[in-house]
Every structure is written in structure tokens, then in C-alpha cells.
Amino acid sequence: IMTTFLQQILHISAFTDKFYLKIRSFNMKDNKTEVKHFFTMFDKYKNLLRELTRKNVKLKYRDSWLGIFWSFLQPLMTMIVLTVVFGNIFGANRKHIVCYPVYLFTGRLLFEFFTSSTKKALTSFRSNAPIIKKVYVPKYMYPLSGILSNFVTFSISILCYICVWIFFKATGLLGGAGLTINFYALLFVVPMAILLIFVIGVGLILSVLQVYFRDIEYIWDVFCTLLFYCVPIIYPLQQITTPWIKAIIKINPLYSMLELFRQCVLYCQPMSWKLLLYALAWALATLGLGVFIFLSLIHI
């Protein structure tokens, strides 16, 4: 155990030293060249990225009887279980929640995409080690293909969400009669795109960290479990009465992206420009940081 611990310390030290030296030797001209090369390689290998993404989707359901149908069934079963468990506690609050199962579904859908994609990116180098050793492919293709394969699954799950929405609207169960739809519902692609950019940034950072610090996989699992309860997925934000806790939740970029998504598909109202700019700033900053760290520490 002590030997393993010392190895992890050495890996962290190597990571911090290399990153520190990269920052000290930062040159705008050289970094522009690296970034240009990054996107040039992306364009060159875009067909390979498509194939890697397709492979990841197929492998995910390869040994399953129901196959890709799990993209419908899994979020649906999760919604039913969480509605039974938390419905009586939070679902009765009709003032802040129109239809609790649909409210829960939207939150769970986005959060599941975030966690599954980042975990896939985190382990992408390890799971593709045989290919990396034999064939040259730009390294960022591996975390990126993992994220995009989960985005495909996420997009399919949107169809399940539509079916759930129609069911509760038609039956009027659990406040479903209060659901509405208009033009603003079509704008859901905007927060989806922002979330995808944010996830790519986080995924690039995690994939690099995992190379130097293997325990990050377990730390990230614990972090995602805690994060689930720190984002208003199963409860409305208005139910939090402590001001400083509410302020911390609002700082979380996932909250702003989730709220934007709900404003479109659940409340069918214009998106808040303040939330939109805040979420976009977080997404672009995280992507920029992810690309910088990746180029600094991984030879593409």
C-alpha cells in the first residue's frame, strides 16, 4: 500500500512539474500553432472519429438482449423509481414543479449524460491502450469518441422524454395537465450544445489526469454521487431556504445548463439571457482549459 501511495505521489509531482513548466514557457505564437494543429488533425481524422463513436455505441449494447432499447428503458425505470421515492416529498409542491416525473426526467437525463460521458472520457486511454500502442491516432480522438457515443445515446433518450411528456399531458396524472408546449421548446438544442462543449472540456481534463493519477477514477465516482444531490434534479431550488446554500448551487455551471433546458422543454418560456451567457462562458472556458492541458501534457 505504501509503495502504491508513493507511486501516486510521484505521478502527481510529475504532472504538476510538467504543467508548471508549460505555463512558465507559455508562448502565444507557439500555442496558436499547437491549437491550429489540434483542429487540423481533427478535420483530417473526422471520419475515424465517426467510426470510433459508432464502435463505442455498438460495444455498449453488444451483449445485451434489448440492445439500444436500453436508451429508452433505463431513464424510464430510473424516473419511476425516483418518483416513487421522492414524489411525496417534492412532487406535492405544485407551486414550483408542474409535473414531478417530467421535472425529474429532465434533470436525470442531463446529469446522466454528464456523468457517463466524463467517466467514459476518463478511462478512454486505458480502454484503448492496445490500439494506441499499435496505430497512430490523435490521442484526443479517444475521449472525444467516448463522449460523442454517449451524446448519441442521450439524443435517443430525448425521444423517451417526448413519450413521457405526451403520456402525462394526455392523462393529466401528477400535474401533467399543466404541461404546455410552444415554439420555445425547439430551443432545447441550445443548452444541449452548451452542455456538450462543457463535457468535452471536462472530459479532456479528466483523461489527462487519469494518465498521471489513476485514483482519479474513484475520486470522480464519489464526486459525481455528491454532485447529484448538489444540483436541483430531485428537488426545486426554491425549496432551499438557506441563502448561502442556494448561492453555491447557482454557481454550479450544471445548474444553469439544467435550468436552461427546463425553461425550454418543461416551462416552454424564453431562456434567461443571464443564465445563457453564464453557461456559455463556463463551457467555453472549460473547453479552452481542457485543450490547453491536453496539448501541454499529452503528445497528440
Predicted regions and their residues:
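Short hydrophobic targeting helices and cationic amphipathic motifs
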Residues: 6, 10, 20-21
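Generic extreme N-terminus detector
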Residues: 5-6, 32
